[in-house]
Amino acid sequence: MLLDDELLSDIIKIPPFRYKIISAFEYDFIIDAMFGIGLSRDVTGVYAQIIDEINRVSAVKVAVDIPSGLSAGIVQVSNKKVKADYTVTFGFDKTGMVLYPGRKYAGKVIVSDIGFAVSQDNVQKILENNPARMIEKKDILTIPEREADGNKGTSGKVLIAAGSRSMGGAAFMSAQSAYRSGCGLVRVFTHENNKNALLTLVPESICDTYNDKNSNCDELTKWCIWADCIIAGPGLSVSGQSEEIVKCILQSGSDATLILDADALNIISENEEYYEYISRYKGKVIMTPHVGEMSRLTGKSIGQIKGNPVETALCYSKEHGVICVLKDAATVVCDHDNIYINTSGNCGMATGGSGDVLTGVIAGMMCAGFDDECFAAALAVYIHGCAGDMCRKNQGTFSMKAWDIAESLSTVFTQNNTDYN
């Protein structure tokens, strides 16, 4: 490790240590251990030269705890940072290298247990620097077992209000992924134009419809009361009629968990009074904006949101009393007490309909029997990413489609030895 000459001399009263930069081209492996996890300034001088030298060579680069130039608890990175092939981090993942852009520099992350003493003070210090938790593959095993004498009703009843005249596919993908994620009954409330296609693609679903002249809110209210979980918004469009449908759901008197996605979010961003409806809704509310939708909801620029997604999601969650699922390359899930950052998934999932599939997975986890809805939502995001990673192996990032992701869900569950095996 390189130490400042004067600082070293002052502290331990020995003659100054002299170092020289050795060409990194001479080595097959480079261990990066220059800085700790709390770096909060730009890297300058000889350290900047060393980082440039390390990044120029083809040697395998292994960072200790965190790549030099990154900080554990913040998204912003310094002007110079080591681009590691591997990072061996101690005790737990660090937020600054799980979120982008830091994630691009960490390479494959290996968490090493070095026997941190678990005390209240230690836990508090860890949370101050690294407030977020990362879902792991082993968390899939926490999905509650199904009752041996259960039935389709006890496995979870989901209502999906989705699909306008020209965007029926969103409803189909949400329904398919809800079934693939363990839901017992899925009822789709959609435009009448979508009925035949829905019953062809997802014949297990129950279909109720509205048309251009009649929003059928009386029937919709009845099915809101019936449901254990409601999805509202995918492909719904933004119109007077879709506003009426979303308002009907929020004022239905249902206590079902409500997932607001896509056009439901766009409607809310244009109608401030809907926040009052949300505050009076009896059940738990989950909002699932991508960064563009979050920009419209908050008035922040996309750059501001990407610059600090954890703070953005957490503030929004606390302000409106909802679980926020802020979707991006590293999705953030939070409520007023918990923060999760997703580590699964890949760039091939940036395709139309991927978010609609996610809403179905979230609905599945809401119906699975978890006591903690925020954890269940974060687990759903992780499972969705695992399905995308499976598609990367089978279809590749260039060619995967949202339907492929939905169809890969069952393999994620069976390969991880859940009760769905």
Task: Locate predicted features.
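Nucleotide and nucleotide-moiety/phosphate-recognizing core
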Residues: 1-36, 42-64, 245, 257, ...
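Small-residue (G/A/S/T)-rich helix-start motifs and N-terminal tracts that mark the onset
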Residues: 1-2, 24-27, 97-258, 262, ...
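Short secondary-structure transition/capping segments
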Residues: 8-12, 74-76, 198-201, 336-338
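Internal gly/pro-rich beta-alpha loop/helix module
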Residues: 27-29, 34-128
